[in-house]
């Protein structure tokens, strides 16, 4: 248990495209690097420059990857997704995160020329599910803004899906 005033790190599930395209890999690396300031990033491999567009070659195949990633998603306190590069996997992860009641931040770059799916933008409720437009040079600032608002002091263990998030500010962002 953390002492009063001590920040307890989050378990963060980061979503980014793998098989849908690796064009944003360098950006994912910046995001994961920043997310490490706020807690343990369970899905650091998404940012790995060595990860091929066809995905990782796990010993148990696709089923193993699915089960492992769902276990990480259940463990996570918060989900952060870069949703500019369309990805069926990221959409699936977000749907599962919603079903699990996880707080979600989706980041989208309108300057990409893409249009974000209505199923993502339309899910935003300004509270548990947030979609923020940003420019690439703002990514660290956006993450800082989100976690500064959501991370309370002296929170409990990550067995609670919202343990590292401050519920008193959910409506204020």
Curated annotation (Swiss-Prot):
Cellular location(s): Cytoplasm; Nucleus
Similarity comment: family membership: Belongs to the 2'-deoxynucleoside 5'-phosphate N-hydrolase 1 family.
Source domain of life: Eukaryota
Gene field: Dnph1
Phosphoserine: residues bearing it: 17, 87, 112, 117, 127, 158
The organism's taxonomic lineage, starting at the top: Eukaryota, Metazoa, Chordata, Craniata, Vertebrata
InterPro entries in the cross-refs: 2'-dNMP_N-hydrolase, DNPH1, Nucleoside_deoxyribTrfase
EC number(s) reported in the record: 3.2.2.-
Organism: Mus musculus (Mouse)
Official protein name in the record: 5-hydroxymethyl-dUMP N-hydrolase
Broadest EC class assigned to this enzyme: hydrolase
Alphabetized PANTHER family for the sequence: 2'-DEOXYNUCLEOSIDE 5'-PHOSPHATE N-HYDROLASE 1 (PTHR15364:SF0)
């Amino acid at each position: 248990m953390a002492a009063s005033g001590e920040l307890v790190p989050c378990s963060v599930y980061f979503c980014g495209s793998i098989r849908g395209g690796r064009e944003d890999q360098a950006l994912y690396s910046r995001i994961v690097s920043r997310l490490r300031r706020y807690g343990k990033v369970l899905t650091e491999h998404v940012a790995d420059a060595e990860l091929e567009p066809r995905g990782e070659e796990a010993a148990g195949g696709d089923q193993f990857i699915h089960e492992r990633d769902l276990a990480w998603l259940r463990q996570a306190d918060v989900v952060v997704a870069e949703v500019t590069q369309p990805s069926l996997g990221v959409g699936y992860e977000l749907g599962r995160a919603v079903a699990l009641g996880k707080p979600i931040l989706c980041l989208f770059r309108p300057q990409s020329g893409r249009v974000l799916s209505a199923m993502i933008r339309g899910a935003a409720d300004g509270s548990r599910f947030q979609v923020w437009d940003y420019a690439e040079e703002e990514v660290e600032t956006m993450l800082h803004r989100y976690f500064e608002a959501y991370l309370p002091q002296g929170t409990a263990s990550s067995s609670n899906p919202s343990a590292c998030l401050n519920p008193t500010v959910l409506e204020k962002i």
